[in-house]
Amino acid sequence: MTAEFISSIEEIIEDQKNGKMVIMVDDESRENEGDLILPAEKVDDKAVNFMAKYGRGLICLPLTASRVRELNLPLMAQNNQERDPTAFTISIEAKEGVTTGISAQDRATTIQTAIDKNKCENDITSPGHVFPLVARDGGVLVRAGHTEASVDLARLSGNIPASVICEIMNDDGTMARVPDLIKFSQKHQIKIGRIVDLISYRLEKDTNIKLTHEGKIDLMQENEFDLKIYESLVDKTEQIVLSKGDVSNGEPVMVRVYAVSYTHLRAHET
């Protein structure tokens, strides 16, 4: 893809923060498609209508796995046989505030109901005209799809981690590829970003671990160490950090890394 037409992830995040749609493209070896993406809390009837009129693809609602559990939404297919499986749940509709459910206003109402933390499964019904997708925990670092990219962008831009996406199709019904997406971008003044760049951004600048436990521990003849346990937000693995003294003064600190073999530990325990 010609670099001059690609915006930085920082620019993409800024537009998402300001309620502007962006186009995200995935790898040519994958779907090789571009999706319109907008944080769900920024979506109104005008946004839905734009996606339906100009995007032309299926309008979907990527949600975190935790939100899907809160809404008690089962997967559409238990045995997903897609080439690049997308986790569709059953379709939904807001229980109140809609008519037939298909209008731009009705779909916007359903979207806002689904992401409202004060709403629960009793506030939606199925089937409907909005198609939730389950984003993998860990985002694009686990699965480099539009579902995960859109939720990552919503979170990184300070919005509720939920998004609305729509594949872009050409006038003749074929899928829009890079040359078509560039023309679409220029016509509608919408920035283009790449999922591969979002992956790099997250690896470099995003916080991918969280502190879960900290305390003191006596080791090696009663020498006291600070103990901290960090959990990966990507794959839930844990890392144990032992430190002694002040390691935050900017001075170089010797670091040793030990790979723990649980098989070896169990062998010694027996």
Residue ranges of predicted features:
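Conserved small/polar residues in nucleotide/adenosyl-binding loops
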Residues: 263-270
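Structural motif
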Residues: 20-23, 35-37, 57-60, 87-90, ...
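Long, charged alpha-helical interface segments
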Residues: 184, 190-191, 195-259
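Hydrophobic alpha-helical hairpins/lids featuring a short glycine-rich hinge
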Residues: 81-138
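N-terminal glycine-/serine-/threonine-rich phosphate-binding loop
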Residues: 2-30, 35-37
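Feature captures the catalytic cores and cofactor-binding loops of soluble hydro-lyases/lyases
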Residues: 32, 42-59, 159, 163, ...
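Glycine-rich, N-terminal phosphate-binding loop and its surrounding beta-alpha-beta segment
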Residues: 44-103
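Glycine-rich phosphate/pyrophosphate-binding loops
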Residues: 31, 129-131, 141-142, 148-175, ...
